[in-house]
Amino acid sequence: MPLVVVCGLPSSGKSQRTEELRRALASEGRAVYVVDDASVLGAQDPTVYGDSAGEKALRAALRAAVERRLSRQDVVILDSVNYIKGFRYELYCLARAARTPLCLLYCVRPNWPSRELREASASENRDLAVSVSWRPRAETGGKSQAAGAVEEQRATSPVANGGVLAAVSKELDPEEILPSNPSAVMTPGSEKSAEPASCAFPPEVLESLALRFESPDSRNRWDRPLFTVVGLEEPLPLAEIRSALFENRAPPPHQSTQSQPLASGSFLHQLDQATSQVLTAVMEAQKSAVPGDFLKLPGTTEPLRFTRPLTLAELSRLRRQFISYTKMHPNNENLPQLANMFLQYLNQSLH
């Protein structure tokens, strides 16, 4: 089934849009798999985007995870920055090789990452970055907690950077408040962890990603169909995405994405034998030839025009080239004509 590539800068709403799309497709009974940075790293690590070697390894891990999941039965959603068009082209080739459609979901946050928005987002995340542990009232005998403990339920924002923070249950009392890790919050029913707070990305990493970001272009075949959503208020174009994923025909495979036919052992043996015999015959025939003659070799109908003395090294190099090309397009029907085909190749290559 199709591949959905989600791209955009950190804190642009990618994880929230991914979860929204996952829920919509899962409600139709479809199997949906989400691949993100945390699922391949084991834990969210924003600093990996500041290290070229680590980022390269991350892209390789994401590509491998997508390739393992990609099939004609399941929907795969890749939730990552995906800011390099070359990497998006690799994903396009994966989908094309699997003969399954692909679409791109581009999440945009206006004026991000500006300094003012970063400071405001960091302030909001500091207010939300608390972890509450509870103890049932029965264990405390219904008594109030120690001094300084919070007695009233504190409702948190339902959405923070695409992750869902569960409300505190009325049956439990807070016991202590400790710093938390926002990336550890899991979305119910999802296989992926929530996107980390934007303050987890150092400002220099955000600015570097913004400068390096290669925006999708619908004129590129690997970037279309392209769906752009601005902010979190704009509704997700679910109808158009469904049409692109399930109604469009998958792109046909071409030579770079389809498996080459396997050549039989006898074909390769006869190819090697025929070209070797031609080389031996040419080296012997040119001993009595003068420039301008046409060499007639035994067992062939194609003459070889003799223009200058040929060395064994030059003929061996052309023979290797011919064998490499012929192995890519094996055809048992050409077995009787291998020697003539090699002579035609020599006539075109020799000057």
From Swiss-Prot:
The modification N6-acetyllysine is found at residue 143. The modification Phosphoserine is found at residues 157, 198. It comes from the Eukaryota. Keywords: Acetylation, ATP-binding, Nucleotide-binding, Phosphoprotein. The modification Phosphothreonine is found at residue 156. InterPro entries: KTI12/PSTK, P-loop_NTPase. Residues 177-197 are annotated as: Disordered. Coiled coil: none annotated. The keyword ATP-binding applies. ATP binds at residues 8-15. GO terms for molecular function: ATP binding. Gene3D superfamilies: P-loop containing nucleotide triphosphate hydrolases. SUPFAM superfamilies: P-loop containing nucleoside triphosphate hydrolases. Belongs to the KTI12 family. This is Protein KTI12 homolog. It comes from Mus musculus.
